[in-house]
C-alpha cells in the first residue's frame, strides 16, 4: 500500500539529487549519483525549499487533521525566518514565494505562474483536500488559476497513481497524455509551472524505475531540483520508498526532520 512516506522520501531524494545542478543548462553535465556542492555549495543529500515547504504542509495536517492555509502560511514563514523544516536553514527561495510570505498574499499575475506551489503539492494527495482546498494552498504563494489548476491536476494524478493506475493513465486523465510520445527536446525544464508538471510526468511515463525517473529529471537541466522533486514524489508513489537506491537514502540528510512531519 502506497503511503505518504513513499511520496515524501521520493521527493526529498529527487530534490537532493538536483540541488547541485540547479540552473545548469541541459547536456552541460550528466548526473549519475548523489553528489554535493555545485550550485549552492551544499553537502550531498541536502534537499531544498521544495521539500521544506512540503514538510511544512505535512506537519500542519499532522497536527490539525485538516487543510488550513493560514496555518501552512505560518509554517512557511517559520521555515524562511527560523530554519524550520530544514537541515541547515534556508538557502534557496523563489521570488514569488518570498514576496507572498512578506505580504500574506499569493501572486495572482500571469508572471506569477512559477512552480513554487506545484513543488510542495503531492502530499495533499494523501489528505481529504478538496479541489478548492488544493487551490487555496497553492494561492498562499501562487494564486493565478494556471498554478492553482496545475496543483489540482497534480493531486488528482497522484491519487490515481496511489490507487494503482499506470503513469500513462494518470497523465491522460489530467490532459497530459501527450507526454507519452513527446521527444526529450519538446520537454522544457525551467521554472514555469506547466513546464515542470509536463517534465515530471514525462520522466515518470518514459522510465521504468525510481532511479531512472529522477536521473532523467535532473538531466533535463535548469530547474533540476524542482523537476526531480515532483518527479521523485510521483515515482515514490509508483515504486515505493523501498525502491530508492540504498546509497541515496543513506546519503539523504535530515531524515529525522522528514519523519517527524509525516501523518
Q: Which functions belong to the PLM regions below?
A:
Residues 1-263:
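Structured, active/binding-site neighborhoods that engage oxygen-rich ligands
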Amino acid at each position: 500500500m502506497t503511503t505518504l512516506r513513499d511520496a515524501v522520501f521520493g521527493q526529498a531524494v529527487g530534490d537532493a539529487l538536483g540541488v547541485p545542478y540547479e540552473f545548469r543548462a541541459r547536456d552541460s553535465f550528466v548526473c549519475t549519483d548523489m553528489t554535493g556542492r555545485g550550485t549552492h555549495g551544499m553537502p550531498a543529500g541536502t534537499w531544498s525549499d521544495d521539500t521544506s515547504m512540503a514538510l511544512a504542509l505535512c506537519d500542519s495536517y499532522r497536527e490539525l487533521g485538516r487543510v488550513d492555509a493560514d496555518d501552512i502560511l505560518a509554517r512557511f514563514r517559520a521555515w524562511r525566518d527560523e530554519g524550520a523544516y530544514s537541515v541547515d536553514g534556508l538557502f534557496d527561495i523563489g521570488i514569488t514565494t518570498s514576496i507572498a510570505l512578506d505580504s500574506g498574499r499569493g501572486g495572482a499575475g500571469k508572471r506569477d505562474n512559477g512552480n513554487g506551489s506545484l513543488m510542495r503539492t503531492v502530499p495533499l494527495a494523501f489528505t481529504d483536500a478538496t479541489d478548492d482546498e488544493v487551490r487555496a494552498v497553492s494561492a498562499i504563494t501562487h494564486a493565478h488559476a494556471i498554478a492553482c489548476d496545475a496543483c489540482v491536476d497534480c493531486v488528482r494524478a497522484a491519487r490515481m497513481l496511489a490507487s494503482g493506475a499506470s503513469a500513462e493513465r494518470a497523465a491522460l486523465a489530467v490532459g497530459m497524455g501527450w507526454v507519452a510520445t513527446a521527444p526529450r527536446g519538446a520537454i522544457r525544464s525551467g521554472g514555469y509551472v506547466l513546464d515542470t508538471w509536463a517534465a515530471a510526468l514525462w520522466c515518470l511515463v518514459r522510465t521504468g524505475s525510481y532511479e531512472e525517473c529522477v536521473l532523467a529529471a535532473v538531466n533535463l537541466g535548469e530547474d533540476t531540483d524542482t523537476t526531480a522533486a515532483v518527479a521523485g514524489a510521483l515515482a515514490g508513489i509508483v515504486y515505493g520508498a523501498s525502491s530508492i537506491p540504498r546509497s541515496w537514502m543513506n546519503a539523504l540528510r535530515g531524515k529525522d526532520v522528514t519523519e517527524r512531519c509525516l501523518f
